Amino acid sequence: MYVVNPILTGPEDLENRYNNLKPEAKVGQYAKNIEAIINAYYAKKDAGFKTNIGAIAPDFTQNDVDGKPVTLSSFRGKYVLIDFWASWCGPCRQENPNVVAAYNKFKDKNFTVLGVSLDKQEGKQRWLDAIKNDNLTWTQVSDLQFWSNAAARMYNIESIPANFLLDPKGKIIATN
């Protein structure tokens, strides 16, 4: 028996096929890779429930452009658009004028934006320049860990731009 690519058959089917293998077939690097795929699938599936519409947004803290820690829950009482983006992301930069327009339209109506950058440490200056050049006047944070950004992982971000709109109680009311 052999295992079929999970993209073609789905992770559940991969798991079923793996579970039906004989014990001696479950040793070695290929078996470890298959286990890793199955475990990653369930981890992402579980993480997704935390960021579904209606869920309370997972709290996180990251440093702002001045190195000061900012916690998402400190914005409770306002509508918050969490905007995951990066200076190197063309679609993000193209979307920034729309985010600026929304911010300017609603900033006096109990609304703000929290930008979360997926830039790298070596791209910090480019991130700061993009904030200035794109007129992003709201709070910006990042741990400068690229796709390993802790908040992005918590929110199961696989592509950017990505957005989550929170109500004043911190509940997710819309995405993207």
List PLM regions with ranges.
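Structural microenvironment flanking redox-active thiols in thiol-disulfide oxidoreductases
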Residues: Q94-D134, L144-R153
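Short active-site neighborhood of thiol/selenol oxidoreductases, capturing the structured segment around
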Residues: V70-R93, V99
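Short, internal strand/loop/helix patches
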Residues: P58-N63, L128-K169
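Active-site acidic short loop of glycosyltransferases
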Residues: R76-K78, D108, L136, I157
